[in-house]
């Protein structure tokens, strides 16, 4: 066999192998069931996004598997993150939807972290967790002027230490702006915090505005709940008159705490991730499926109807942000640790 023929045979062989591998992946998900493990309670923002994905993402995964949503609450989604890292099989059939802010928790040595967040196989995110703080009308406080003048601390609910999007926002705002706040933590999700606020157990709470405006829509429209503060770099288009937290920061340190304690982690808060060791080809199939889903007209229409904003984050961008957290200046991390834990 001369060299030209040998090269041709080799090329054909590799083409057959490649086609077989591609066919294997396209067939892998056929007839299978994928689980999304949500770290928060049913009825909240994380849960709503996961259930939307379960309805629309299968059409963009070869083999069109069924996708089911399971809620595993506890410790601000820490229990679910630990489960995905340590228990879930790395077979491409289970991924988690939990707080990516645990990257900060790991750097700061929070107890209960049983994973290295850098080793998760990231899929990305459908939305960012850019937050607003809302208080009930019954609390008697409907403006920042009233809040700064309050004689007693305002009770704000959070899901738990390390749960970025609720806990970090409340604690950083309290420290940076010297606001009278009493943190009431331990709620299983935003749905539970809504109920607590409406019953008078707490005065208000915070989570991503793009989720809040959909899941707390009736109370916001009726005026029984009022947004008093935005914790984002720029105002949301539909909240042009609500002030920004950073505009009340009186020192460079206060601004830095808000920037790195709230703004920076917002893109990784609503993490979607697979267990370490998941085959790369299966992860790529799911990443592509996710990217196609967020562009799907029916998915977008459902999100619009529910008033849930979409702001996709790629797996690569998420990993870069996580890696960046591990490179933050030690002095800043020490200050944040003293505030958050």
Region locations from a protein language model:
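Cleaved targeting-peptide boundary
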Residues: 23-31
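A ligand-binding cleft/hinge motif common to bilobed small-molecule-binding domains
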Residues: 100-112, 167, 171-176, 204-249
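Short loop->beta-strand "edge-of-pocket" segments that line small-molecule binding or catalytic clefts
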Residues: 32-42, 146-163, 203, 226, ...
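Ligand-binding clamshell of periplasmic/extracellular solute-binding protein-like
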Residues: 53, 75-77, 92-105, 125-127, ...
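An extracytoplasmic/periplasmic, membrane-proximal ligand-sensing/linker region
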Residues: 30-32, 222-224, 228, 241, ...
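Hinge/capping helix and adjacent helix->loop/strand transition within the periplasmic-binding protein
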Residues: 59-63, 83-94, 103-199, 249-257, ...
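Bacterial N-terminal signal peptides
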Residues: 7-20
């Amino acid at each position: 066999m001369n060299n030209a023929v040998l090269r041709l045979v080799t090329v054909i062989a590799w083409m057959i192998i490649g086609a077989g591998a591609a066919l294997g992946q396209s067939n892998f998900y056929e007839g299978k069931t994928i689980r999304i493990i949500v770290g928060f309670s049913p009825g909240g923002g994380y849960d709503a996004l996961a259930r939307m994905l379960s309805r629309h993402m299968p059409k963009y995964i070869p083999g069109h598997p069924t996708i089911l949503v399971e809620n595993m609450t506890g410790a601000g989604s820490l229990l679910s993150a630990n489960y995905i890292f340590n228990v879930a099989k790395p077979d491409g059939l289970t991924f988690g939807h939990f707080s990516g802010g645990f990257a900060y928790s790991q750097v700061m040595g929070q107890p209960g972290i049983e994973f290295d967040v850098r080793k998760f196989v990231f899929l990305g995110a459908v939305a960012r967790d850019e937050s607003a703080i809302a208080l009930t009308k019954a609390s008697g406080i409907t403006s920042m002027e009233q809040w700064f003048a309050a004689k007693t601390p305002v009770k704000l609910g959070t899901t738990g230490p390390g749960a970025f999007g609720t806990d970090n926002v409340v604690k950083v705002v309290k420290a940076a702006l010297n606001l009278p706040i009493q943190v009431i933590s331990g709620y299983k999700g935003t749905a539970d915090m809504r109920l607590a606020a409406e019953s008078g157990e707490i005065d208000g709470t915070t989570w991503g505005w793009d989720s809040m405006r959909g899941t707390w829509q009736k109370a916001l429209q009726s005026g029984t709940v009022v947004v008093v503060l935005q914790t984002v770099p720029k105002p949301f288009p539909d909240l042009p008159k609500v002030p920004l937290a950073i505009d009340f920061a009186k020192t460079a340190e206060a601004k830095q705490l808000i920037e790195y304690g709230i703004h920076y982690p917002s893109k990784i808060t609503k993490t979607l991730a697979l267990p370490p060791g998941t085959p790369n080809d299966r992860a790529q199939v799911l990443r592509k499926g996710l990217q196609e889903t967020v562009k799907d007209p029916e998915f977008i229409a459902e999100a619009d109807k529910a008033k849930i904003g979409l702001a996709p984050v790629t797996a690569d961008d998420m990993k870069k942000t996580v890696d960046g957290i591990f490179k933050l200046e030690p002095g800043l991390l020490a200050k944040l640790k003293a505030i958050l834990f």
